[in-house]
Amino acid sequence: MYLNNYQHLKNKETYLLFFLFLFSFLIRIPVIFIFGDTRLDNEWGIIVNNLTDYGKFSLVNFGDFFVPSLFMPPLYAFYLYFFKIFHFNNEIYIQVVLFSQIILSSFSVVIFYNINKLFFSNKICILGTLIFSLFPLHIYACAQISSIILQSFLMITFFYFFLKIMKKNNFYNICFLSLASGLLILLRGEFIALFLLSILYLALFIKINLKSILIIILLTFVVISPYLMRNIIVLDTITITKSIGFNLWKGNNPQTDVEGKNYIYGSIFDQEDLDLREQINKVPEDKYYEINLDKVFLSEGIKNINNDPIKYFGLYLKKILSFLFIDLNSSNPYYYHPLHYLPVLFISITSIIGIILSKKNSYQINFLILFFIVNVAIVSVFFILPRYKLAIIPLQIIFSNIFFEYIKKNFFKT
């Protein structure tokens, strides 16, 4: 009898997960055809075309010399390049990329449901998962050539296996946590700091054994090692990306705002700041070009902050509030559409209430809160684009679910 009931519940859950995946997949398809990008633009287009035409991972070239690039994290560029090997025409190629992002997004919904199961009742799990699936920003992002969907998928995978390790420290969970960690490091430069924070949390608060910690670090290193070795051999530097200077300057210069203005990599050579333009023009055109260029921007960004610390601290706080809630001065034409800002504002407010109501003795929830705070604090040092919000929406929904669970238990008792 017990086994029959267990099997029935497992079958019921399987059907639910299949429904969540299929539902999420189908509702995203029309968005591709209505709002979907139609070509590779800006940095992604340059790198992928150079990979395709010349076999060079490069963003800048001087004639026939292609500068080995460190500016862009490599994972999404190679993700885009993977679909190029099938020699689709441009229209089909873009559609295939966008459909692949729909698949990742739909799997994210399924994994997100499993995360919620660790904390909440079945009704709240389903509610939170449907909010994530139907969240307009999440749906819209699938139609854009951007790394944010891949980041969201990997981040949710990371959270799932991290939380699983807290309960069951086995090699299976360690392998998938390490894989997600390595890929996230190859996708987002700031994740290195978040990874180290997570490892420290496992060691200090969860107190998992040293052997497991070392295996996680080793396997993560194995994932990033091919690209890391490329940078060591070709550019004599131990790093994944080298764009912290540009990103710091983009978010902290006299003309900037929360979004860092509309500076793209190619526009940096047309500066109104004559002194900065002169420094850029003096950078030697060799294989270390991007490294030395980033040093120029790093120096300039630090100088800006030192010259007017009150202004840039105020801007930093403004970026934090814009990241947590909404940006009151966004340049994005769709940002103030009610389908965007109302869900964002609602889930942002309810998530803060959820954090306040959360159990302070829960190591799992405490980790998510700590990760959330540190992530927001790090990213806000630079600039906040509207799509960045999707990276923290899953955590905000989890925190909101704490509030929804509180309402359910206290006002809808059965």
Protein language model regions, located:
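Transmembrane-helix signature of polytopic, membrane-embedded enzymes
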Residues: 95, 107-134, 152-153, 172, ...
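Short helix- or helix-capping micro-motifs
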Residues: 21-27, 125-136, 160, 181-185
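Membrane-proximal stem/loop segments at transmembrane-domain junctions that anchor or position
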Residues: 235-318
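Membrane-proximal lumenal/periplasmic loop motifs of glycosylation machinery
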Residues: 31-42, 54-81, 303-307
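Transmembrane-helix motifs of polytopic, lipid-linked glycan transferases
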Residues: 99-119, 157-161, 349-356
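Membrane-interface transmembrane helices that cradle and orient dolichyl/undecaprenyl
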Residues: 119-122, 158-176, 184, 202-208, ...
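Short hydrophobic/aromatic helix or loop-helix immediately within or flanking a transmembrane segment
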Residues: 45-51, 66-89, 316-324
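Loop-to-helix entry region of an early transmembrane alpha helix in multi-pass inner-membrane enzymes
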Residues: 74-78, 86-107, 126, 141-144, ...
